């Protein structure tokens, strides 16, 4: 079937409206991730998404949205409300929107029978004017077993994110607009948004319709305060004096060469640093050698990283992740971390822990109590574990005599302690994290230099400063001048 987008005249805008269907979204029971994927993919296909709507599981409401969107946009994509249950009403709503009847479709009847089981018959009842699109499953290279249903310019996608993504990937030809290609550029600025607002307004007035300039503050980033996005349609980001003038007017030193994909690109960046020959690079190379030795001696199921959200174990986790990316790229096992929960953890640290688990795709092994108690619990619950990678440095208490591979002491649960960072300094840790734009706990940007629980951790007095108004403020931990004052945060 010829796609509607391919029939358009060259240069004509192709637009889309997205309707997300589901009471579970409106009630907060389920987090919608489909919108982000649909918008990003459609834009990559030259399609401008103009509106997103979330509708409840109500036939009349969905039908009204479909009618409105169908008249206004080239394509309408719905997600959700397709299934065997009473609240799956999208087919019925679309039929109502176009004055169609619901009728069983022979091909869908055959497809539902192939699914096996009972209760799937409802999926074969579609609007009488429906078209079926089989596409190619990107995972198998074969046509989808169950087709995508469309009615006029409305395409009815499933709500399951993994399935929706596969279907859209296999149906790109329905929406591809070769006449238009969107180009974008991102800038990261370490300056308050209000302070650069006049500069941005003047730049947008100068660019006019050639360029869309967006400004998005980020209060949770360790590296920038504002992300600027510059978008153009059908051409690359304009050159000439416009672009240099914008960057030149931003506060001096505020542009950050930020890498938003630091975790995905960890292997390339970490090994490049290790091979640089710099002082830090040599420390990285030594740590990687220890980690690679561990990977040669133990499987991933026998290893875990001791992780409490601190700066040292964050650097260690990134190194370990990079080494696994390089040495074991095809091993599906997630990396394991051991988290020993304190009695009163910082909420910010707990949030960072959850973000890190998602960011690195980790499996968390949780324990409580002292280190000795936690290792005993770990051994009892996960007997396959044999070694724990630790972010210990020689300057830590009771650590000056450790070796890269140190068995636990007699009387302790038997584990091999692997210490890749023994010879690293406080400055080495921060240089590594900051140079590679590794995300770390936001508390370090608020004056804490060493993290424990809320009961034994305070801001480091060495970082305290007075603001112009006379109020006390704290510089970030990476600006600590005397490394011997690192543990001033612990009481």
UniProtKB/Swiss-Prot annotation:
Phosphoserine found at: 9, 467
Pathway(s) served: Cofactor biosynthesis; FAD biosynthesis; FAD from FMN: step 1/1
Record region (Disordered): 461-491
Modified residues (N6-acetyllysine): 282
Designated name of the protein: FAD synthase
Family recorded in the similarity comment: In the N-terminal section; belongs to the MoaB/Mog family. In the C-terminal section; belongs to the PAPS reductase family. FAD1 subfamily.
Pfam (any one): PAPS_reduct
Top enzyme category: transferase
Keyword flag ATP-binding: yes
Extent of Acidic residues compositional bias: 481-491
Entry keyword Transmembrane helix: no
This enzyme's EC code(s): 2.7.7.2
Record's keyword terms, sorted: Acetylation, ATP-binding, Cytoplasm, FAD, Flavoprotein, FMN, Nucleotide-binding, Nucleotidyltransferase, Phosphoprotein, Transferase
N6-succinyllysine: residues carrying this PTM: 282
Organism listed in the record: Pongo abelii
């Amino acid at each position: 079937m010829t796609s509607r987008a391919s029939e358009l005249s060259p240069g004509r805008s192709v637009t889309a409206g997205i309707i997300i269907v589901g009471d579970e979204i409106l009630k907060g029971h389920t987090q919608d991730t489909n919108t982000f994927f649909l918008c990003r993919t459609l834009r990559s296909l030259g399609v401008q998404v103009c509106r997103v709507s979330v509708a409840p599981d109500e036939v009349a409401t969905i039908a009204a949205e479909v009618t409105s969107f169908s008249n206004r946009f080239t394509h309408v994509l719905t997600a959700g409300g397709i299934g065997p249950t009473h609240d799956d009403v999208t087919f019925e709503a679309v039929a109502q929107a176009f004055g169609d009847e619901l009728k069983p479709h022979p091909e869908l009847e055959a497809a539902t029978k192939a699914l096996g089981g009972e209760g799937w018959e409802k999926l074969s009842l579609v609007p009488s004017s429906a078209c079926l699109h089989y596409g190619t499953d990107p995972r198998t290279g074969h046509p989808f077993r169950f087709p995508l249903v469309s009615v006029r310019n409305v395409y009815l996608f499933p709500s399951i994110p993994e399935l929706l993504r596969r279907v859209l990937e296999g149906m790109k030809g329905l929406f591809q607009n070769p006449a238009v290609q969107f180009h974008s550029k991102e800038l990261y600025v370490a300056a308050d948004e209000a302070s650069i607002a006049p500069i941005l307004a003047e730049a947008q007035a100068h660019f006019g319709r050639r360029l869309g300039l967006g400004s998005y503050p980020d209060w949770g980033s360790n590296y920038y305060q504002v992300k600027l996005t510059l978008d153009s349609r059908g051409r690359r980001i304009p050159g000439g004096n416009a672009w240099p003038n914008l960057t030149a007017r931003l506060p001096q030193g505020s542009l950050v060469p930020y890498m938003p994909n630091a975790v995905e690109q960890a292997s390339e960046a970490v090994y490049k640093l290790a091979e640089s020959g710099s002082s830090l690079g040599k420390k990285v190379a030594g740590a990687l050698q220890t980690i690679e030795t561990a990977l040669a001696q133990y499987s991933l199921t026998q290893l875990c990283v001791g992780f409490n959200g601190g700066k040292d174990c964050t650097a260690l986790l990134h190194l370990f992740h990079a080494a696994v990316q390089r040495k074991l790229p095809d091993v599906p096992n997630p990396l394991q971390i051991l988290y020993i929960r304190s009695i009163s953890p910082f909420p910010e640290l707990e949030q960072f822990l959850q973000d890190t688990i998602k960011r690195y795709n980790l499996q968390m092994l949780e324990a409580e109590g002292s280190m000795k108690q936690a290792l005993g619990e770990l051994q009892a619950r996960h007997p396959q574990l044999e070694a724990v990678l630790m972010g210990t440095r020689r300057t830590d208490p009771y650590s000056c005599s450790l070796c890269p591979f140190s068995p636990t002491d007699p009387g302790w649960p038997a584990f091999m302690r692997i210490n890749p960072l023994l010879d690293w300094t406080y400055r080495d840790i921060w240089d590594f994290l900051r140079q590679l734009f590794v995300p770390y706990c936001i508390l370090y940007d608020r004056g804490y230099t060493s993290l424990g629980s809320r009961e034994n951790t305070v801001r480091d007095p060495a970082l305290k400063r007075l603001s112009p108004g006379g109020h006390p403020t704290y510089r970030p931990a990476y600006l600590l001048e005397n490394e011997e004052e690192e543990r001033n945060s612990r009481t």
